[in-house]
């Protein structure tokens, strides 16, 4: 017997960036697989059907940290909560002692705290986890030597904008330059990493920018099956070492 078709809007809120909504639905083209989606206005921001690159952001950053000699009691900050897969993947590594996620949209944080999303219970209840309502970009590039409580961290992972040149909010563009990246770098320990997810292929110009700030930069292409196109989609992950 086929599973029943589901389409439900779980929440709808107004935010400074526009109207944001969370919905869950079954996908009849995928045997009624249950998926969760977030829309901002008329734009689809994210889907639980495509989370491979978000997970790889954490996995690749933690792998590089360990190669750099940081293998326990890791302190990780994630910019952008979304559906929570970058944050959850960090928590799945027991070398991570503390993982704080900053998101400018309170409704997104509330979805996890209320258990509306599959990973929300873990993110809201794990003692190593903290969800913070705030502007990641303001926090990351202020004049202090640390981040949140003036403390340097092992990794800062960013999953907010579509790419370094395609921003969720025009104001975010001021982060992707030498001065801002250098300010953020001061908040990361030696041998620590900055990781960035992008919905696009690696951008050589952004890699050059990272090379001017960090000691080592990696570009990773993450490909995954796209059942809608019948082919593969490609995201990318940048990992830069302090």
Where on the chain are the PLM-derived regions?
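Histidine- and/or cysteine-centered catalytic micro-motif in compact active-site loops
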Residues: 43, 161, 199
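Rossmann-like AdoMet
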Residues: 1-64, 92
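Conserved beta-strand signature within the Rossmann-like core of class I S-adenosyl-L-methionine
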Residues: 191-198
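Loop/helix-junction capping segments adjacent to catalytic residues or to phosphate/diphosphate-binding pockets
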Residues: 47, 84, 204
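The AdoMet/dcAdoMet-binding core of the Class I SAM-like
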Residues: 51-187, 217-223, 229-231
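Class I S-adenosyl-L-methionine
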Residues: 14, 200-242
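A short, structural micro-pattern
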Residues: 16, 32, 103, 231-234
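A broad, low-specificity signal marking well-ordered, structured residues that form hydrophobic/aromatic
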Residues: 20, 36, 129, 237-238
């Amino acid at each position: 017997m086929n599973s029943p078709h589901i389409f439900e809007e779980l929440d709808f809120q107004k935010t400074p960036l526009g109207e944001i909504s969370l919905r869950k639905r079954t996908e009849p083209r995928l045997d009624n697989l249950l998926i969760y989606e977030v829309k901002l206005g008329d734009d689809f921001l994210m889907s639980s059907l495509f989370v491979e690159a978000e997970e790889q952001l954490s996995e690749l950053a933690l792998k590089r940290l360990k190669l750099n000699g940081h293998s326990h009691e890791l302190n990780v900050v994630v910019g952008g909560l979304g559906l929570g897969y970058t944050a959850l993947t960090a928590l799945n590594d027991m070398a991570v002692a503390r993982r704080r996620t900053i998101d400018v949209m309170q409704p997104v944080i509330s979805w996890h705290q209320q258990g509306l999303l599959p990973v929300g219970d873990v993110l809201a209840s794990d003692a190593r986890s903290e969800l913070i309502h705030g502007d990641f970009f303001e926090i990351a590039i202020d004049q202090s030597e640390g981040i949140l409580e003036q403390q340097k961290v092992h990794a800062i992972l960013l999953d907010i904008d579509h790419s370094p040149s395609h921003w969720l909010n025009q104001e975010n563009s001021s982060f992707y330059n030498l001065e801002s990246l250098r300010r953020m770098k001061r908040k990361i320990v030696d041998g620590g990493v900055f990781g960035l997810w992008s919905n696009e292929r690696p951008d050589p110009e952004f890699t050059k920018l990272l090379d001017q700030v960090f000691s080592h930069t990696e570009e990773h292409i993450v490909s995954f099956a796209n059942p809608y196109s019948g082919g593969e989609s490609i995201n990318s992950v940048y990992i830069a070492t302090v």
